[in-house]
C-alpha cells in the first residue's frame, strides 16, 4: 500500500498534470489515499510543504520518499 501511495504522490508532484497547484494536489491525494487505507499522515504543514518541494526538486529517491511516508504515517484506530 505504501508503494502505491508513494508512486501516486511522486507522479502527481513531478509530472505537472495540472496548470497550477500540482504540489497541493499531490499532497491532498496522498493524504486521501492514506485515509482510504486507514492511515493518517502525521506531518506539520511546514514539514509536508518542505517534503513536497524536495520531491518536486528531485532531491529524494523513490525509496527515500517511501521511507518518509512510512515513518510519518500512523494507522487509524479500528472501530
List each model region and its residues:
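Amphipathic alpha-helical segments in well-ordered regions
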Residues: 8, 12, 32-33, 55, ...
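Active-site beta-strand/loop microenvironment that shapes enzyme catalytic pockets
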Residues: 12-40
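Helix-hairpin-helix/helix-loop-helix acidic hairpins
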Residues: 1-11, 15-17
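A structural-propensity feature for long, helix-poor, extended segments
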Residues: 54-68
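Short, conserved aromatic-histidine micro-motifs
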Residues: 42-57
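N-terminal alpha-helical segment
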Residues: 5, 26, 30, 44-48
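C-terminal domain-closing interface element
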Residues: 64-79
Amino acid at each position: 500500500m505504501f508503494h502505491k501511495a508513494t508512486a501516486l504522490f511522486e507522479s502527481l508532484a513531478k509530472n505537472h498534470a495540472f496548470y497550477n497547484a500540482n504540489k497541493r494536489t499531490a499532497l491532498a491525494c496522498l493524504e486521501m489515499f492514506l485515509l482510504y487505507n486507514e492511515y493518517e499522515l502525521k506531518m506539520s504543514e511546514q514539514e509536508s510543504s518542505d517534503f513536497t518541494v524536495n520531491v518536486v526538486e528531485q532531491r529524494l529517491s523513490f525509496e527515500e520518499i517511501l521511507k518518509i511516508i512510512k515513518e510519518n504515517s500512523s494507522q487509524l484506530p479500528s472501530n
